Amino acid sequence: MVNQKRFLDNFILVEYNNLSYPEGYTAQIQEVAAHFDKDVIDPQRAYSMHTEYSYGKRKYNTELISKYPALIAASKNGVPQLWKSAEWASEFADFIVDLVSGHSVPTIIEIHPPFNDYCSLAGFVDRFRIFENKIHEAYPDVIIVIENRAGSVYHGGRFLVGKAKEIVALCDLIKSEALNLGVVLDFPQLLTAENIDPLKFKTEKYQSAIQTIAEHRDLIKGIHIWGKKKSATGRWVAHAGNFDTYFGGND
């Protein structure tokens, strides 16, 4: 059994959606939503910007987003197509700087991968450089990280970085191209991408995925661990419940 105190002592804790940690632990960083339908943020302390993640449709109806035609145009049935072009990458950086204006500089900016029906890893790297140059010109010390993704209402492709082998391919490029980019490893999304059923958990398959990524542990700057539970209709609800509901009470 993992010693909870010793486990949590290894991390800088991030507050998600005003949820609290066990007694004796306080989050040092606040996660702030920064998707394309946001036109204002309200950080209360050091914060991590959780930028557009392309799960579902956006309205694109704020005064702020109206300034960025490339961001609006890069949409399929309302779902944002991240990293669609060089112009998109440039406007994405400007959007973030605009959103931050009047507030303290973020500690972390968390980005997300494109879909694979219009962008390759090489294309992402080229567009990320444009974004990174503008962001670090504005905020030299900000940490930029990318999260592995799985799950979206998008049709036509899937996220470019979701499975363990795709995370490794990205890490290889980060190193070979000397990108100023870290990785946030989202464990539940990794399970989804690898088709690991939490109610019929296959330890060997999970360990294989983790061992594949382990060689790049130096690039892993953070992790996401969260619960799930099933709704009344039997649909999984993310960021809800706990590990008991997620794994069916199995050890």
Which residues are covered by each model-predicted region?
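Active-site acidic/histidine proton-transfer and metal-coordination neighborhood
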Residues: S66-G182
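Short, flexible/disordered intra-domain loops and linkers
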Residues: R58-S66, L121, Y154-G162, E194-E204, ...
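N-terminal start-of-chain detector that recognizes signal peptides
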Residues: N3, S20-E23, Q81, D117, ...
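N-terminal pre-domain/capping segments
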Residues: M1-S90, D94
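Short, flexible, glycine/charge-rich loop motifs used to bind or transfer phosphoryl groups or to couple energy/partner
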Residues: D37, D172-I174, Q211-I213
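Histidine-acidic metal/acid-base catalytic patches
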Residues: M1-N10, D42, S75, S90-T107, ...
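Conserved beta-strand positions in the central sheet of alpha/beta enzyme cores
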Residues: A27-A34, S48, E110, V145, ...
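Active-site beta-loop-alpha junctions enriched in small/polar residues
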Residues: V14-L19, A33-H35, H50-G56, P114-N116, ...
